């Protein structure tokens, strides 16, 4: 039995008090939540301190909160900020634990079957276990997640019911505890003590929970009774203190007992028989043979080991769900009245909508060709309407809310005024004729003042040509293309801020972490070419890149005024007028943001190495050259898998294995 701790309030720690229009935004959001409003939008301009406002709301409504971001990097940044705001509460991080993941796939055109291949990040796996155990043990929990939170996770009831609860004085023999640990997927290893393992020394059992990375527990027995439970350092064995209660959650999120396993296997066998009849009736004998061989092997593994590769494909039977019923996800671990906050909702909600269809298309091919049973289709992410069914109360947070959010609610809380008094930049439109010379003059003005420039183009060729032209003109310039990885991008931004170069050119400068206070000019080329990066939302987001500098200015180069341009200019002017009126009333003089220049530390502690171009004659390489080539190939393999080019990813994987075999 899990004793959930007494309700503990969120305690926000910050040296700042709410300012600008943060106080009215916080009050409005809290009032709406407390009055039972299901959905609302926080329309916060860039740099107005939306994360701080979110933290204030969480601390005042005191509900377990799920914050969803649209990628790992952004989730990592938010996790760090919330940890600083709530040092005494449980702030957790839940993203995909795969460093590399190539899903199982079949390509009929070339009759190519590609097995699932992945590498798991142990640090992130630990953080995921920490998130689920915190949700079951306490109320003061904030989980910052990517859209991985809508993927299947296993039953929270099975997970909670399987937990082993221990107290000093409890009657339980050492062997009973060992059996209980094995049942919840802990592994005995008396030599290599790691997460999810235990070791035994006489009447002492040491257990390393899956949710910890440095601290383990020592359980000391006196006969068939627990004498004492101590928290220890896993590496040195140093005693940190006594514990009066210890709850050990399963070492994996997918757990089941023997009785349940036999029931699941019976259902798998029944489904196999039905599908074999169907294939044989259609004359698909190869598919029938393939399915029988594979499924019977998996059943044997489940009986003997309690596990098989791809066990998640049988999750419908394991969970006791009906066909088509949604899987259990992280959302099921929360209590019913929890709060959801969607960061950058204009991006995140689109991702949530698209996950299901992409997953189904790939799995349907595996089912049609006899690689998987039809029930594998129920190991999937939630549909958007299924996600909506989990929503008790939700806050969409964005500078440019999407159509979906606007359809969900009319309740919009604006946060336009920045605590620094900074204004939205002035925007002007200039003709594209002679834009290069005009732009060069504007850049030189900024260089003289020690300021920086962003230029956004629509095509790779234009970005490259412009980079070459500016270099010839003596401008220190860099082009940031889409192939650059997160940490390399951070290095480029740092160099721009330090003045190593003065101009950054890119196609999509809306990525996270590209807010640079030193940038006073943003130039938008081909502003009149309607599309993703030149629609109203894209333009407003791009304009916002100049909003962290007191002299922020935006120039759109265009031959005509599109509706998107006009709406973006009008909205920016509206916000600027509100900000100017506030500054005048309160005697505030806008000051450029002072922001420390520091390197980003990845949440997973992984360092992305710069890889050299791989040569084709691998055997003539030195060992270190081969290692560099392997890193580059792994990067290419991951990108191929993300683009669903499974054949190329499989070829690269095989090449990596060959290279590793040389050494």
From Swiss-Prot:
Keywords: ATP-binding, Cytoplasm, DNA damage, DNA excision, DNA repair, Excision nuclease, Helicase, Hydrolase, Nucleotide-binding, SOS response
CC annotations in GO: cytoplasm; excinuclease repair complex
Segments forming domain UVR: 627-662
Gene3D superfamilies according to UniProt: P-loop containing nucleotide triphosphate hydrolases (3.40.50.300), UVR domain (4.10.860.10)
Any Gene Ontology biological process: SOS response
Binding residues for ATP: 44-51
GO molecular function, one term: excinuclease ABC activity
Subcellular location as annotated: Cytoplasm
Pfam family name, one: Helicase_C
Domain Helicase C-terminal span(s) in chain numbering: 435-601
CDD domains for this protein: DEXHc_UvrB (cd17916), SF2_C_UvrB (cd18790)
Motif (Beta-hairpin): 97-120
Residue span, Helicase ATP-binding domain: 31-271
Presence of keyword Nucleus: no
Family: Belongs to the UvrB family.
HAMAP family: UvrB
Subunit-structure text: Forms a heterotetramer with UvrA during the search for lesions. Interacts with UvrC in an incision complex.
Domains: entry comment: The beta-hairpin motif is involved in DNA binding.
Function as written in the Swiss-Prot or TrEMBL entry: The UvrABC repair system catalyzes the recognition and processing of DNA lesions. A damage recognition complex composed of 2 UvrA and 2 UvrB subunits scans DNA for abnormalities. Upon binding of the UvrA(2)B(2) complex to a putative damaged site, the DNA wraps around one UvrB monomer. DNA wrap is dependent on ATP binding by UvrB and probably causes local melting of the DNA helix, facilitating insertion of UvrB beta-hairpin between the DNA strands. Then UvrB probes one DNA strand for the presence of a lesion.
Protein name listed in UniProt: UvrABC system protein B
Organism of provenance: Streptococcus equi subsp. zooepidemicus (strain MGCS10565)
């Amino acid at each position: 039995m899990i004793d959930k701790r007494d309700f503990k309030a969120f305690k926000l720690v910050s040296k700042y008090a709410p300012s600008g229009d943060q106080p009215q935004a916080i009050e409005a959001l809290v009032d709406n939540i407390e009055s039972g409003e299901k959905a609302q939008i926080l329309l916060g301009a860039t740099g107005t301190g939306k994360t701080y406002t979110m933290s204030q709301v969480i601390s005042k409504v005191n509900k377990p909160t799920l914050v969803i971001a649209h990628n790992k990097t952004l989730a990592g940044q938010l996790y760090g900020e919330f940890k600083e705001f709530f040092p005494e509460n449980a702030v957790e991080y839940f993203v995909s634990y795969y460093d590399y993941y190539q899903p199982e796939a079949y390509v009929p055109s070339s009759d190519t079957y590609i097995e699932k291949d992945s590498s798991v990040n142990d640090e992130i796996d630990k953080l995921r276990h920490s998130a689920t155990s915190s949700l079951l043990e306490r109320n003061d929990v904030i989980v910052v997640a990517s859209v991985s939170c809508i993927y299947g996770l296993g039953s929270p009831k099975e997970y909670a019911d399987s937990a082993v609860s221990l107290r000093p004085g409890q009657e339980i023999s050492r062997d009973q505890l060992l059996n209980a640990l094995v049942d919840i997927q802990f592994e005995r290893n008396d030599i290599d003590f790691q997460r999810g393992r235990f070791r035994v020394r006489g009447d002492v059992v040491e257990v390393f929970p899956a949710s910890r990375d440095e601290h383990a527990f020592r359980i000391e027995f006196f006969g068939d009774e627990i004498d004492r439970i101590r928290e220890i350092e896993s590496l040195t064995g140093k005693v940190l203190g006594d514990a009066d209660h210890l709850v050990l959650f399963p070492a994996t999120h997918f757990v089941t007992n023997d009785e349940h396993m036999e029931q699941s296997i019976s259902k798998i066998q029944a489904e196999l028989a039905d599908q074999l009849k169907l294939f044989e009736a259609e004359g698909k004998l190869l598919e029938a043979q393939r399915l029988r061989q594979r499924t019977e092997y998996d059943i044997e593994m489940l009986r003997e080991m309690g596990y098989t590769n791809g066990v998640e494909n049988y999750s419908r039977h394991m969970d006791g769900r009906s066909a088509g019923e949604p899987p259990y996800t992280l959302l099921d671990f929360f209590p019913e009245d929890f709060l959801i906050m969607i960061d950058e909702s204009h991006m995140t909600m689109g991702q949530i909508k698209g996950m299901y269809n992409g997953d189904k298309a790939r799995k349907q091919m595996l089912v049609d060709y006899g690689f998987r049973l039809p029930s594998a289709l129920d190991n999937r992410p939630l549909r958007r309407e299924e996600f909506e069914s989990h929503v008790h109360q939700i806050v969409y947070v964005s500078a440019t809310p999407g159509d979906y959010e606007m359809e969900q609610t009319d309740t919009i809380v604006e946060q336009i005024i920045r605590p620094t008094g900074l204004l939205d930049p002035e925007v002007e439109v200039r003709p594209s004729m002679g834009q290069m010379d005009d732009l060069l003059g504007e850049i030189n003005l900024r260089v003289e003042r020690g300021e920086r420039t962003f230029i956004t183009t629509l095509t790779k060729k234009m970005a490259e040509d412009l980079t070459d032209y500016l270099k010839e003109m003596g401008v220190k310039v860099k082009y940031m293309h889409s192939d650059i990885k997160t940490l390399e991008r951070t290095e480029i931004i740092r160099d721009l801020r330090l003045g190593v170069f003065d101009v950054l050119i890119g196609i999509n400068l809306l990525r996270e972490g590209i807010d640079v206070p030193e940038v006073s000019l943003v130039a938008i080329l081909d502003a009149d070419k309607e599309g993703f990066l030149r629609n109203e939302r894209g333009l407003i987001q791009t304009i916002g890149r100049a909003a962290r500098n007191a002299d922020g200015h935006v120039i759109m180069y265009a031959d005509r005024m599109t509706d998107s341009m006009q709406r973006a200019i009008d909205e920016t002017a509206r916000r600027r007028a509100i900000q100017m009126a506030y500054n005048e009333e309160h005697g505030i003089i806008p000051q450029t943001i002072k922001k420390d220049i520091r390197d980003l530390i990845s949440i997973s502690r992984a360092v992305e190495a710069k890889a050299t171009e791989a040569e084709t004659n691998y055997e003539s390489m030195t060992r270190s050259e081969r290692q560099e080539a392997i890193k580059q190939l792994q990067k290419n393999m991951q990108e191929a898998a993300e683009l669903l080019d499974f054949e190329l990813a499989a070829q690269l994987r095989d090449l990596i294995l060959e290279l590793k075999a040389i050494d």
